[in-house]
């Protein structure tokens, strides 16, 4: 739990707040750009890259020797999440016919909501029984599974743009 993390990494409250803030900033700030990257370079490719970066960030978090390294690794995770997030909705919109798209988006939304509720509960259990590092190690098998399933089931869709224009 948080006191264990603070004790093991000799971190104060401000540093531990940055563990979450670094992740959130790294997710939100590049979102518009990362969505466009999917349009230009391909949604499946950007999804897999994002999941991979997220996974590498999770491993870096789990082995972080200092709170500063943990904060940086959380930012890496956030960049990975930012790369994958816009691709999911884009792929759903492109591969499902109009009459099935609403159901597909609904299932996607429900899965995301259940994960948002179950994640902290499962994380609390893991951290309570195995230490704060378990909250990061648990991502690794899901990262591998997500990449394998995306490569097997998500089609390589044609890109819709040829360049990224800067404003």
Q: What is the meaning of each model-derived region?
A:
Residues 148-166:
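Helix-loop junctions on the cytosolic side of multi-pass membrane transporters
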Residues 1-152:
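Transmembrane-helix bundle of Major Facilitator Superfamily
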């Amino acid at each position: 739990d948080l006191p264990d993390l603070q004790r093991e990494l000799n971190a104060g409250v401000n540093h531990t707040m940055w563990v979450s803030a670094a992740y959130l900033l790294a997710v939100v700030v590049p979102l518009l750009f990362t969505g466009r990257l999917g349009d230009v370079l391909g949604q499946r490719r950007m999804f897999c890259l994002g999941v991979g970066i997220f996974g590498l960030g999770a491993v870096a978090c789990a082995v972080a020797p200092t709170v500063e390294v943990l904060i940086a690794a959380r930012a890496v995770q956030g960049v990975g999440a930012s790369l994958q997030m816009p691709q999911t909705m884009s792929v759903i919109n492109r591969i499902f016919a109009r009459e099935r798209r609403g159901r597909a988006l609904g299932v996607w939304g429900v899965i995301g909501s259940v994960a948002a509720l179950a994640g902290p509960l499962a994380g609390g259990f893991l951290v309570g029984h195995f230490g704060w590092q378990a909250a990061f190690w648990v991502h690794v098998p899901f990262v591998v599974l997500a990449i394998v399933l995306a490569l097997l089931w998500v089609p390589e869709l044609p890109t819709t743009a040829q360049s990224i224009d800067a404003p």
